[in-house]
Amino acid sequence: MRKSPKPNFARDGSESRQDKFRSFNKALKTSKPSKDFSRFKLFIEYEGTRYSGWQRQENAKTIQGAIVKAANEIFSNDFVDLQGSGRTDSGVHALCQIAHLDAKTVLAPEIIRMKLNDLLPHDINIREVEKASQNFHARHDAKTRCYLYQISKRRTAFGKNYVWWVKDKLDFKKMESASKLFIGMHDFSSFSDDDPEEKSTKVLIDDIQMKEEGDLILIRIVGSHFIWKMVRRIVGILVEVGRGKKSEKDILNYMNNKSNEVAKFTAPPSGLFLEKVLYEEEKLSDDLNPAIKI
């Protein structure tokens, strides 16, 4: 008789992140919305400092969980589902996350926006709501995702939740040159943690842009999708290049040979923003501007 796989547990004996995701997604797959519902496209911004990421988890405060709670109050038994374009990690922010919301009760998009914002905490805001086709899917239809990372060259009293303050002097030109190595289709297994949600560690990076603006270094990474901690580890290794502790040769070695060393260079979540999610025929502005100025 075949034995069921044993669950993974964290060091404190609690269920691991991977098993929490498996349980949650199993529950999602067993509850399919009926055809008798309306679908709405939500444009969401949030300050992720207080949250354990986007995806709803048991016994954890999450962005999706907060919006689902508010939607349940508005639609009661008529609320069906809420799905985001992707998961942001604990502490990561969003300038424009996209989600679709399904409900059997038909309300005007602007009424939904106002009612949700009345119930949501101060650090989550629904910027806009649009009526969408039932065939629209926030995650599956997304063509491109864009992340912005902010590095601060100085200590800041007001912006510490929105930047990574790097005390060392950084060589911007070396960082910018090294960033181009990531463009294209590559195996990013050295730059991510194991994730049960992802079938492959290969990711297409369309572009990486960098810019110095005042006391900030801005890094924009544009790709088809991103795997767990990937963006923060790319930023972290670029900072090591800027410090003079790593080279382009080291990056190529990490990309060609799986290594656990990159994990220790993971940049903090505070400086990371989901900037934009693009769908068919949508284009990203070439302007690279700070999410929060300091």
Model-derived regions: residue spans:
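Structured-RNA-binding interfaces characteristic of tRNA pseudouridine synthases
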Residues: 2-294
